[in-house]
């Protein structure tokens, strides 16, 4: 078989699928590979997302790599080496024509703050244990969830810029990289397809099939992805675990894996100790779960505890209040899995229309609480205005609704024919095709499953 175009749309999608699995599975040890992919993509298609969006995601990935080394108890020499690699103290600043002065100022300040914070930790302060606990909390699950959402939006923009996926082209690339493996048997690829809203074929690919059309052509309603109708009539108890037969058709669960509710729907719920000794109010992501950590073949189960159930109910109530007061201006529909599970049919009409992908750019917008809404709970003298990487990742007050140049950028990229610039899935997998990226997430217990 002839070698497929390694920088074509199919290869880009496989690289995106691998990156998505790494971030989705919290595989911090592979974050540098995701950084490589994002930098390559930014170099050839700078218009996919705004500069600030790209930098927030990349800085978050780099910071998590360094923090993970610290929390694992690695030697400080190794930690500082990684710190200097990802955050060079006097490294050149990349001048992006799309970057504003405010963007550059915030990014530079966040990098410097993180660098000094790690340097101070390496000097063995007397309260090292409390500092490490604070670091673990600051770069914990809310931070990772915000990064995952940033990457999802990035990949959505990439998908909008690429042509319609063709199953045969995808199979050709996968067969070249992993002989004998079908796109229907690759868990990472199936998960990516489900999350991106495709209907993957259940059988082996024998001809060129348009993966976008079956959503309208497939007659069984239960086989359709809930993108344009994310709130179908639900039978009582549909969120409960079903028999083995329900696990063979993961497509109906697509709407339950994601909710594109903006990060603005969150509550400021805790104070965070700053690196300079004061206290500042720190936003925490409190949004409907926009995907399930399990594999696409898993069904959504009930919350594990009453406390968890209360959190979901509170978040649902927040969204309902926002919709009833008329503050939700986006004409998109909710895709939240557990929100749908808690109240599948009684959501207000405005809430049902909030997060639909029919909206041109609103699902990709991070609409957050304005700064003036955050009232300090400590004296002004104790409040720190230091911007950290965690602030930039969790906070997007100034995220603009103008990311729409991806199509032109990728067309220009295709004309340049830098065929080896974008890393492909080959670089994420062992050549045998039976290896796997170790999954560090507690929700992904099978670390031997293949991509």
From Swiss-Prot:
<dbReference type="GO" id="GO:0032211">
    <property type="term" value="P:negative regulation of telomere maintenance via telomerase"/>
</dbReference>
<dbReference type="GO" id="GO:0032206">
    <property type="term" value="P:positive regulation of telomere maintenance"/>
</dbReference>
<feature type="modified residue" description="N-acetylalanine">
    <location>
        <position position="2"/>
    </location>
</feature>
<dbReference type="InterPro" id="IPR039098">
    <property type="entry name" value="TINF2"/>
</dbReference>
<protein>
    <recommendedName>
        <fullName>TERF1-interacting nuclear factor 2</fullName>
    </recommendedName>
</protein>
<keyword id="KW-0007">Acetylation</keyword>
<dbReference type="Pfam" id="PF14973">
    <property type="entry name" value="TINF2_N"/>
</dbReference>
<dbReference type="GO" id="GO:0070198">
    <property type="term" value="P:protein localization to chromosome, telomeric region"/>
</dbReference>
<keyword id="KW-1017">Isopeptide bond</keyword>
<dbReference type="GO" id="GO:1904356">
    <property type="term" value="P:regulation of telomere maintenance via telomere lengthening"/>
</dbReference>
<comment type="function">
    <text>Component of the shelterin complex (telosome) that is involved in the regulation of telomere length and protection. Shelterin associates with arrays of double-stranded TTAGGG repeats added by telomerase and protects chromosome ends; without its protective activity, telomeres are no longer hidden from the DNA damage surveillance and chromosome ends are inappropriately processed by DNA repair pathways. Plays a role in shelterin complex assembly. Isoform 1 may have additional role in tethering telomeres to the nuclear matrix.</text>
</comment>
<keyword id="KW-1011">Dyskeratosis congenita</keyword>
<dbReference type="GO" id="GO:0016363">
    <property type="term" value="C:nuclear matrix"/>
</dbReference>
<feature type="region of interest" description="Disordered">
    <location>
        <begin position="229"/>
        <end position="257"/>
    </location>
</feature>
<feature type="cross-link" description="Glycyl lysine isopeptide (Lys-Gly) (interchain with G-Cter in SUMO2)">
    <location>
        <position position="341"/>
    </location>
</feature>
<dbReference type="GO" id="GO:0000781">
    <property type="term" value="C:chromosome, telomeric region"/>
</dbReference>
<keyword id="KW-0539">Nucleus</keyword>
<feature type="short sequence motif" description="TBM">
    <location>
        <begin position="256"/>
        <end position="278"/>
    </location>
</feature>
<feature type="cross-link" description="Glycyl lysine isopeptide (Lys-Gly) (interchain with G-Cter in SUMO2)">
    <location>
        <position position="302"/>
    </location>
</feature>
<keyword id="KW-0158">Chromosome</keyword>
<keyword id="KW-0597">Phosphoprotein</keyword>
<dbReference type="GO" id="GO:0005654">
    <property type="term" value="C:nucleoplasm"/>
</dbReference>
<dbReference type="GO" id="GO:0032202">
    <property type="term" value="P:telomere assembly"/>
</dbReference>
<dbReference type="GO" id="GO:0070187">
    <property type="term" value="C:shelterin complex"/>
</dbReference>
<dbReference type="GO" id="GO:0050680">
    <property type="term" value="P:negative regulation of epithelial cell proliferation"/>
</dbReference>
<comment type="subunit">
    <text>Monomer. Found in a complex with POT1; TERF1 and TNKS1. Component of the shelterin complex (telosome) composed of TERF1, TERF2, TINF2, TERF2IP ACD and POT1. Interacts with TERF1, TERF2 and ACD.</text>
</comment>
<dbReference type="GO" id="GO:0042162">
    <property type="term" value="F:telomeric DNA binding"/>
</dbReference>
<dbReference type="GO" id="GO:0016233">
    <property type="term" value="P:telomere capping"/>
</dbReference>
<dbReference type="GO" id="GO:0016604">
    <property type="term" value="C:nuclear body"/>
</dbReference>
<keyword id="KW-0832">Ubl conjugation</keyword>
<dbReference type="InterPro" id="IPR029400">
    <property type="entry name" value="TINF2_N"/>
</dbReference>
<feature type="short sequence motif" description="Nuclear localization signal">
    <location>
        <begin position="262"/>
        <end position="268"/>
    </location>
</feature>
<feature type="modified residue" description="Phosphoserine">
    <location>
        <position position="295"/>
    </location>
</feature>
<keyword id="KW-0779">Telomere</keyword>
<dbReference type="GO" id="GO:0010370">
    <property type="term" value="C:perinucleolar chromocenter"/>
</dbReference>
<feature type="cross-link" description="Glycyl lysine isopeptide (Lys-Gly) (interchain with G-Cter in SUMO2)">
    <location>
        <position position="306"/>
    </location>
</feature>
<dbReference type="GO" id="GO:0000783">
    <property type="term" value="C:nuclear telomere cap complex"/>
</dbReference>
<keyword id="KW-0225">Disease variant</keyword>
<feature type="cross-link" description="Glycyl lysine isopeptide (Lys-Gly) (interchain with G-Cter in SUMO2)">
    <location>
        <position position="353"/>
    </location>
</feature>
């Amino acid at each position: 078989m002839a070698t497929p175009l390694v920088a074509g749309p199919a290869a880009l999608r496989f690289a995106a699928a691998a990156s998505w699995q790494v971030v989705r599975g919290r595989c911090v040890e592979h974050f540098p590979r995701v950084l490589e992919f994002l930098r390559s993509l930014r170099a050839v298609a700078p218009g996919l997302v705004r500069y600030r969006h790209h930098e927030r995601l990349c800085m978050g990935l780099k910071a998590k790599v360094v923090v993970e080394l610290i929390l694992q108890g690695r030697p400080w020499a190794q930690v500082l080496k990684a710190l200097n690699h990802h955050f060079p103290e006097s490294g050149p600043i990349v001048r992006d024509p799309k970057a504003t002065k405010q963007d550059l100022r915030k990014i530079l300040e966040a990098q410097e703050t993180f660098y000094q914070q790690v340097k101070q930790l390496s000097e063995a302060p007397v309260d090292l244990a409390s500092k490490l606990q604070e670091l673990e909390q600051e770069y914990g699950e809310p931070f990772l969830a915000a990064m995952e959402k940033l990457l999802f939006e990035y990949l959505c923009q990439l998908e909008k810029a690429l042509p319609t996926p063709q199953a045969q082209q995808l199979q050709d690339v996968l067969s070249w990289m992993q002989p004998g493996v079908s796109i229907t048997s690759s868990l990472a690829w199936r998960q990516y397809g489900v999350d991106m809203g495709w209907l993957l074929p259940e059988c082996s690919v024998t001809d060129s099939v348009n993966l976008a059309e079956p959503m309208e052509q497939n007659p069984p309603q239960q086989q359709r992805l809930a993108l344009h109708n994310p709130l179908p009539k639900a039978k009582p108890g549909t969120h409960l675990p079903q028999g083995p037969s329900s696990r063979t058709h993961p497509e109906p669960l697509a709407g339950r894996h994601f909710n594109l509710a903006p990060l603005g729907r969150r509550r400021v719920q805790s104070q965070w100790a700053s690196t300079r000794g004061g206290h500042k109010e720190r936003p925490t992501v409190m949004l409907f779960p926009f995907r399930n950590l399990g594999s696409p073949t898993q069904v959504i189960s009930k919350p594990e505890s009453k406390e968890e159930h209360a959190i979901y109910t509170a978040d649902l109530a927040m969204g309902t209040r926002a919709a009833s007061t008329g503050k939700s201006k986006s004409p998109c529909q909710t895709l939240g899995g557990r929100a749908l599970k808690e109240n599948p049919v009684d959501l207000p009409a405005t809430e049902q229309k909030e997060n639909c992908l029919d909206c041109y750019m609103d699902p990709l917008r991070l609409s957050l609480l304005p700064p003036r809404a955050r009232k300090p709970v400590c004296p002004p003298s104790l409040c720190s205005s230091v911007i950290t990487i965690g602030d930039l990742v969790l906070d997007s007050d100034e995220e603009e609704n103008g990311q729409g140049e991806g199509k032109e950028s990728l067309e220009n990229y295709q004309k340049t024919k830098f065929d080896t610039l974008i890393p492909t899935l080959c670089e994420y997998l062992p050549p045998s095709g039976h290896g796997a990226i170790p999954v560090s997430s507690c929700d992904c217990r099978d670390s031997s499953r293949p991509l």
